């Protein structure tokens, strides 16, 4: 039987091994931020926690504890113990925690023990583990050389990164493809969950034995997910690799990402009619989001072309007209913006090349 308390020195092992954790915080706390390997089985529901918190402020700790026991009692208490025991049966090596590793953790552990179930709780709870992960992100740029993968929109940076063991996929963690049209069907994680998942990915990367940390050249915001400032500053100072691709391939890749995959995803989720409506709204609203930068005239031109493409798609099952507005968007908006940004980092460019050439360059970098 392991010790009743899991020490802070084991945080790294918990995250690297995706150790199952029973999170006994209230649902509202879990929703704000949690770890990927945790399951929310609360000691108190939101309303119960709120009442106990109010009592604590007005009457002190002992009165709050007494109220908590009266709220979680009888059949309610038994149901929660059974839910915890069921989780532990399915995850025999599970740990538990609350926010600070205090009373809620101790009480849950005690009630389970009385039911014949032994579960260690984590020292410091969620708060201390979260602080540990923040430290991982802040320290990461000093652990390995940082390389930033740049390239024009549609050149396949994400596809390339997914083939490289040196890479951490920031857009995958943020569930957003980074561009104005980068929104996915499922929502992005909360900011806290984005940071938690980034830190765990960095921890896993540091144990992989690779020579560098390869990241896509991102803006501070990936959709609504903000990169931690210290980490972003390090990315801005990193050496740059430029992935190159032909315009024809870029166009086809963007049509596949913006049109084919998104349309299929919406239809699968919502059905054909509602799916097409949601898909159309996704395209048109993505365009609206860059209207100020495009200017009214150019926005209107792109919107008209986009609507023509949508009409042809729904009436003739033909997506070829989408290539027209995508091509215009590239050459009037994305490419000039990219070239301007690249000019500002030209002194840090180590290599430019195709997918194959870039793979070969990185393979040789690994052995230097």
Swiss-Prot record:
Involved in the post-transcriptional modification of the uridine at the wobble position (U34) of tRNA(Lys), tRNA(Glu) and tRNA(Gln). Catalyzes the conversion of 2-thiouridine (S2U-RNA) to 2-selenouridine (Se2U-RNA). Acts in a two-step process involving geranylation of 2-thiouridine (S2U) to S-geranyl-2-thiouridine (geS2U) and subsequent selenation of the latter derivative to 2-selenouridine (Se2U) in the tRNA chain. GO terms for molecular function: transferase activity, transferring alkyl or aryl (other than methyl) groups; tRNA 2-selenouridine synthase activity. The active site is at 98 (s-selanylcysteine intermediate). One of its GO terms (biological process) is tRNA wobble uridine modification. Monomer. It catalyses: 5-methylaminomethyl-2-thiouridine(34) in tRNA + selenophosphate + (2E)-geranyl diphosphate + H2O + H(+) = 5-methylaminomethyl-2-selenouridine(34) in tRNA + (2E)-thiogeraniol + phosphate + diphosphate; 5-methylaminomethyl-2-thiouridine(34) in tRNA + (2E)-geranyl diphosphate = 5-methylaminomethyl-S-(2E)-geranyl-thiouridine(34) in tRNA + diphosphate; 5-methylaminomethyl-S-(2E)-geranyl-thiouridine(34) in tRNA + selenophosphate + H(+) = 5-methylaminomethyl-2-(Se-phospho)selenouridine(34) in tRNA + (2E)-thiogeraniol; 5-methylaminomethyl-2-(Se-phospho)selenouridine(34) in tRNA + H2O = 5-methylaminomethyl-2-selenouridine(34) in tRNA + phosphate. PROSITE patterns: RHODANESE_3 (PS50206). The gene is selU. Belongs to the SelU family. The keyword Transferase applies. It comes from the Bacteria. This is tRNA 2-selenouridine synthase. The keyword Transferase applies. Residues 15-138 form the Rhodanese domain. It comes from Shewanella baltica (strain OS195). The lineage of its organism: Bacteria, Pseudomonadati, Pseudomonadota, Gammaproteobacteria, Alteromonadales.
